[in-house]
């Protein structure tokens, strides 16, 4: 008869389990939001796999509180008090209060009887919705109250409790049944036989009706319902990031829940706790600041990228050899004079030929430009006695801003790169003029002859002259990373191997791991960093030598400055589309219409930013990819397509940094802001005016192209060049009048 009743109770419990299965899923979803421990998540997986075959008991308890309180929370608030007064505990419930050794002494006898008692706990866990359920004070429970609990539990197991009778959860407050929490010491003194549990959801392993599966489930419940010390060991992996309450030692991952808990648990200790927390944070910030200052090194471009190596110091044998030029049959006394003579021959031939190429080739670096105007701009901005911070001394090219120079150095050159080599003594330098000066001073009165195009050394006059003249032909191979040009592809390939780090900068030796090196184009960029607009903070770049241990303050500041700009991998070195508008600050005479961009400008800017983001987020993992603009392999999309750049002198736009650099150097090598200095000097030396003899059209030296177009459109017109001697007074008055009209 007992077996039939137990089987009937089991069937009723299975039906209620099917009804509440959806609510059970909701319970576990909320448990996941509360960041369960790893051992709890593992039990949840086993429940989801075996919920069709086995019965599962899920209850939610708090730290050092009895687990039986969940069983009594299955009814409505009215029925719960009634059940305590009129009934006694179920024998199965009383077995839970026993130690684990007594609870599983005879598993086969109580396996089926204990099944209905698990169902109310399941209901209570569903009604709690992941919140901590309050615990009952069992010191006030009389033996008369214990007599009716069995009838209450059995009658509830045969009825379906509607969802309206289930206790609604209260977020953040533990007030179920309006009872008070007992402290840890009280629970241990009143219920000495109850097992201690941790502040998390404890679960009893599934148990079936067979006696063979009951014992393993008991063993698993002993592991879960263990003492506080065991549970603390299980949660040890995340204990480093947890903060505990100073009174009850309950641990929290976030600070706000801990504050709410301390307001209820120990309100008198919260102020002291917050002061201690602030002092710890301030110490940590100060330590991080000092560490970041120690782990930061600021270097200039000249110190980081440029270098010089003396080579083998051996005095070459002086032979006062004469050299004869077979073109003009002139005899030169030594090798240096013969080299200068060949250079003059080249200039004379260019003047006699009067070809277009002779007027578009730079006499210093032998680069060719589309027109004479761009050649003049290149000479005045690059080959000057003034040492500007926007000139790359390796390539001998000038850039518009310091940021463009830094981007060029990052993409093209290596630290301590010395591609210019003396083939006689292996003297190396990052600057071409250093090698040329070294050769003229150290190897004078020898048989060695230096080619100014490829630095090849010859020892005979005739082969040297033939080699010299072959460089004037079109079939030459230029190095894209320096000014050298070669006659064969093999020589160019061998030279490319020299574009590497030859000698590591001395400042980088012996640095601790994690040190960040900040490269600046000039010393002035660091001083104007705080007062200048955000675009002026761009000209500093950081090179991370190893994995950083702590984030430096410089990186944090630069990330804050560039927060409103396009997202890049290195925000300190990549130009943005908002750099030019930010260059003009309020107070420089700009009107409101200029300060506020129009709808069309905003739309174009949004479109450019969208293109930049799409290119940077592009990821292709299979095979190698080549950029169709610069014809180079793409290693990283985000750094290769850093931002959308527009040319100020033509309609050229691109997202490729290398393509834009090549465009500026070959097509639009225009003068920068410092070109105004040279215009003043040239105006002081000479005043040249072009006058059309048929009409009133006039043009100065800056309008040579306009005069050429004028004469081309009007075939019958002719012009005359008028050269005036401009005095210093005229230049001063002219500059003063320009200042008045501006």
From Swiss-Prot:
Q: Name one GO molecular function term.
A: zinc ion binding
Zn finger residue spans: C2H2-type: 323-345, 360-383, 390-413, 420-443, 477-499
Task: List membrane-spanning regions.
Answer: none
Q: Where is the composition biased (Basic residues)?
A: 593-608
**Compositionally biased residues, Polar residues:** 138-168, 182-191, 223-243, 579-592
Question: Would you name any one GO CC term?
Answer: nucleus
Record's keyword annotation contains DNA-binding: yes
Keywords in alphabetical order, please.
Answer: DNA-binding, Isopeptide bond, Metal-binding, Nucleus, Repeat, Transcription, Transcription regulation, Ubl conjugation, Zinc, Zinc-finger
Renumbered to this chain, where is the cross-link Glycyl lysine isopeptide (Lys-Gly) (interchain with G-Cter in SUMO2)?
Answer: 10, 23, 42, 65, 85, 123, 135, 180, 186, 193, 580
The segment annotated Disordered runs over: 138-243, 523-608
- Read off the Pfam families from this record: DUF4195, zf-C2H2_Z280C_D, zf-POGZ
Cellular compartments annotated = Nucleus
Instruction: Quote the biased-composition stretches of kind Low complexity, using this chain's numbering.
Output: 200-222, 523-578
Cite the PROSITE patterns for this sequence: ZINC_FINGER_C2H2_1
Q: Which PANTHER family match?
A: ZINC FINGER PROTEIN, ZINC FINGER PROTEIN 280C
Cited function = May function as a transcription factor.
Name of the protein in question: Zinc finger protein 280C
Organism the protein comes from: Mus musculus
């Amino acid at each position: 008869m007992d077996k039939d009743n137990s089987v009937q109770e089991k069937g009723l419990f299975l039906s209620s389990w099917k009804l509440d299965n959806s609510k059970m899923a909701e319970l576990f979803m909320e448990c996941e939001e509360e960041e369960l421990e790893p051992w709890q998540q593992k039990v949840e997986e086993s429940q989801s796999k075996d919920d069709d075959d086995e019965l599962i008991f899920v209850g939610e308890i708090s730290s050092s509180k009895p687990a039986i309180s969940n069983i009594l929370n299955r009814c409505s608030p009215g029925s719960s008090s009634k059940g305590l007064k009129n009934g006694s505990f179920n024998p199965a419930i009383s077995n839970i209060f026993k130690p684990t050794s007594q609870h599983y002494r005879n598993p086969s006898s109580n396996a089926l009887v204990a099944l209905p008692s698990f169902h109310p706990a399941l209901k209570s866990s569903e009604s709690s919705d992941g919140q901590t359920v309050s615990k009952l004070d069992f010191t006030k429970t009389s033996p008369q109250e214990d007599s009716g609990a069995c009838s209450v539990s059995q009658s509830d197991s045969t009825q379906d409790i509607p969802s309206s009778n289930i206790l609604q959860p209260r977020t953040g407050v533990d007030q179920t049944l309006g009872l008070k929490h007992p402290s840890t010491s009280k629970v241990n003194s009143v219920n000495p036989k109850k097992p201690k549990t941790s502040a998390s959801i404890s679960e009893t392993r599934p148990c079936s009706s067979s006696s063979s599966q009951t014992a393993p489930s008991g063993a698993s419940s002993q592991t879960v319902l263990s003492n506080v010390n065991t549970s603390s060991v299980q949660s040890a992996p995340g204990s480093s990031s947890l903060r505990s309450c100073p009174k009850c030692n309950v641990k929290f991952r976030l600070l706000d829940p801990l504050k709410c808990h301390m307001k209820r648990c120990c309100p008198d200790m919260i102020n002291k706790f917050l002061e201690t927390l602030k002092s710890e944070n301030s110490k940590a910030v100060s330590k991080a600041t000092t560490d970041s200052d120690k782990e930061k090194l600021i270097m200039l471009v000249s110190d980081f990228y440029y270098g010089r190596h003396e080579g083998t110091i051996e005095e070459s044998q002086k032979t006062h050899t004469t050299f004869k030029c077979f073109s003009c049959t002139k005899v030169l006394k030594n090798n240096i004079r013969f080299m200068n003579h060949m250079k003059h021959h080249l200039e004379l031939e260019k003047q006699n030929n009067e070809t277009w190429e002779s007027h578009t080739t730079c006499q210093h670096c032998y680069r060719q430009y589309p027109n004479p105007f761009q050649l003049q701009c290149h000479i005045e901005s690059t080959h000057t006695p003034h040492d500007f911070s926007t000139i790359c001394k390796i390539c001998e090219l000038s850039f518009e801003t310091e940021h463009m120079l830094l981007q060029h150095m990052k993409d093209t050159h290596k630290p301590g790169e010395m591609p210019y080599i003396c083939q006689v003594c292996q003297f190396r330098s990052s600057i071409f003029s250093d090698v040329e000066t070294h050769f003229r001073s150290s190897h004078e009165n020898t048989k060695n002859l230096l080619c100014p195009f490829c630095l090849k050394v010859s020892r005979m006059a005739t082969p040297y002259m033939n080699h010299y003249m072959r460089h004037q032909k079109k079939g030459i191979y230029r190095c894209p990373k320096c000014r050298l040009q070669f006659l064969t592809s093999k020589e160019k390939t061998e030279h490319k191997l020299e574009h590497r780090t030859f000698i590591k900068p001395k400042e980088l030796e012996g640095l601790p791991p994690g040190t960040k090196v900040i490269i600046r184009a000039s010393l002035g960029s660091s001083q104007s960093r705080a007062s200048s607009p955000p675009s002026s903070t761009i000209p500093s770049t950081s090179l991370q030598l190893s994995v950083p241990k702590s984030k430096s303050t410089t990186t944090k500041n630069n990330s804050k400055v560039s927060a409103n700009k396009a997202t890049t991998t290195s925000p300190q070195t990549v130009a943005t589309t908002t750099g030019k508008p930010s260059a003009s600050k309020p107070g420089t005479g700009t009107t409101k219409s200029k300060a506020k961009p129009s709808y069309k400008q905003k739309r174009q800017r949004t479109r450019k930013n969208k293109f930049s983001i799409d290119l940077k987020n592009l990821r292709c993992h299979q095979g190698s990819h080549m950029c169709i603009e610069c014809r180079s392999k793409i290693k990283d999309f985000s750094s290769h397509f850093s931002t959308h750049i527009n040319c100020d002198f033509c309609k050229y736009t691109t997202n490729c940094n290398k393509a834009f650099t090549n465009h500026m150097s070959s097509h639009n090598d225009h003068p920068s802001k410092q070109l105004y200095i040279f215009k003043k000097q040239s105006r002081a030396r000479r005043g040249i005016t072009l006058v059309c003899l048929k009409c009133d059209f006039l043009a100065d030296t800056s309008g040579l192209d306009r005069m050429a177009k004028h004469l081309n459109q009007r075939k019958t017109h002719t012009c005359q060049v008028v050269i005036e001697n401009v005095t210093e007074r005229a230049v001063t008055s002219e500059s003063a009048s320009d200042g008045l009209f501006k």
